[in-house]
């Protein structure tokens, strides 16, 4: 029984040393290393002879020695692998940072657009408030222009009627002028006609005087 216990302990220690020799990183066992010690130990245990116990006792020692000697190498490999893993993670981080920056840039652009839209939305109510005033002013202006246009349109017929009235007035004035000119001509004629009569009368008066002599 004691031999069996030692066998179990030896196999457990051998597995642990083999695992250390293979190298454990962050709880993940790497299987890249050669696992030569385990089959030898298992083969010795499978023989079941008395010499196997001695071989088992020697095998753990050699395994422990190999493990001690391999430990620095595994530590160096582990450090290298850690460095490589760190580099990979850094690269991944760099890529992720770039991607995140890109996404952040896009999100910032979107946020900027959203903020601009929000600012415009905030500004639009004020402009909308201003616009109703402008629209109100424009409406009042249009209303003012419409009556002005109506007044301009309505005087147009009146203006058209006024020239007709003016034309009628000159026509009425023309007959008046004609009537005025006609009496003046008659008066001039009447004034001219008595003049010869007056001239004839002296001749008649002059004639009888010599006749009387």
Curated annotation (Swiss-Prot):
Q: Where in the cell is it found?
A: Cytoplasm, Cytoskeleton; Cell membrane
Listed under GO cellular component are:
cytoplasm; cytoskeleton; plasma membrane
Q: Where is the lipid attached (N-myristoyl glycine)?
A: 2
GO BP field: actin filament organization; blood vessel lumenization; cartilage development; central nervous system development; neural retina development
* Knockout mutant characteristics: Morpholino knockdown of the protein results in reduced head and eye size and a ventrally curved body. No significant effect on formation of craniofacial cartilage. Formation of ceratohyal cartilage is disrupted with an abnormal angle relative to wild-type. Morphogenesis of the developing neural tube is abnormal, with a smaller angle between the walls of the hindbrain neuroepithelium at 24 hours post-fertilization (hpf). Retinal development is significantly delayed; no retinal ganglion cells (RGCs) are detected at 30 hours hpf and reduced numbers are found at 60 hpf.
Q: In what way does this protein cross or attach to the membrane?
A: Lipid-anchor
Q: Which parts form a coiled-coil structure per UniProt?
A: none
Supply the alphabetized keyword list. Cell membrane, Cytoplasm, Cytoskeleton, Lipoprotein, Membrane, Myristate
Molecular function (Gene Ontology), one example: actin filament binding
Q: PROSITE patterns, per this entry? A: MARCKS_1 (PS00826)
Q: Where is this region: Effector domain involved in lipid-binding?
A: 90-113
List the biased-composition ranges (Low complexity). 149-158, 175-185, 193-205
Q: In which tissues is it expressed?
A: Expressed at low levels in brain, eye and muscle.
Please give the residue ranges the record annotates as the region Disordered.
1-213
For the keyword Oxidoreductase, the answer is: no
Biased amino acid composition, Basic and acidic residues: 54-64, 77-88, 161-174
The entry sums up its family as follows: Belongs to the MARCKS family.
Q: What does this protein do?
A: Involved in the control of cell movement by regulating actin cytoskeleton homeostasis and filopodium and lamellipodium formation.
UniProt name for this protein: MARCKS-related protein 1-A
